[in-house]
Design a protein with these regions (language model features):
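Extreme N-terminus of proteins, especially the signal/transit-peptide cleavage junction
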Residues: 3-11
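Acetyl-CoA-dependent GNAT
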Residues: 11, 15-80, 84-86, 97, ...
Length: 148
């Protein structure tokens, strides 16, 4: 029990910096689910916009960055939330999601949206956090909404 408490107390959230980009790419490509078939689909311009203009947070522990989230504060869309496979179940995803939705509330949003693959662990994670499925988009991904 004390190991669980100790691990969770060592998690830190902070804004992402340019110095985090190599590790952010490792995290993004270090997930078994939702692999990018073409890594060039996520452009440096897109990542730079989120870093400069949106909510872009990392979760780290004593080892380093283990997860990140990017949220468009203008639309309430959660563009990305990833935790590297070896760090699942340690609270990184929950803390990132809670912080992102809190920030959206602070800027006046009453709801948030995201999409994820159908039948994935991510789908179960979002459902367990109270996100409601709204149907599927044209790519077959589940569209979720959370009232803030």
């Amino acid at each position: 029990m004390t190991d669980i408490i100790r691990m969770r107390s060592e998690l830190r959230l902070r804004p992402a910096t340019r110095a985090d980009l190599p590790r952010i790419h490792e995290v993004r490509h270090g997930t078994a689910e939702n692999r990018l078939t073409d890594p060039t689909l996520v452009t440096d311009v897109e990542v730079a916009w989120y870093m400069d203009e949106a909510i872009f947070l990392v979760s780290e522990d004593e080892v380093g960055v283990q997860g990140f989230t990017c949220v468009n504060h203008q639309t309430g869309y959660v563009w990305a939330l990833f935790v590297i496979d070896g760090a699942h179940g340690r609270g990184h995803g929950t803390r990132l999601l809670d912080a992102a939705t809190a920030r959206l509330r602070e800027v006046g949003h009453r709801q948030a949206f995201l999409t994820t693959g159908s039948g994935t662990k991510a789908e179960g994670f979002y459902r367990s956090k109270g996100w409601q499925p709204m149907g599927k988009n044209m790519k077959g991904e589940v569209v979720f909404r959370l009232w803030l």
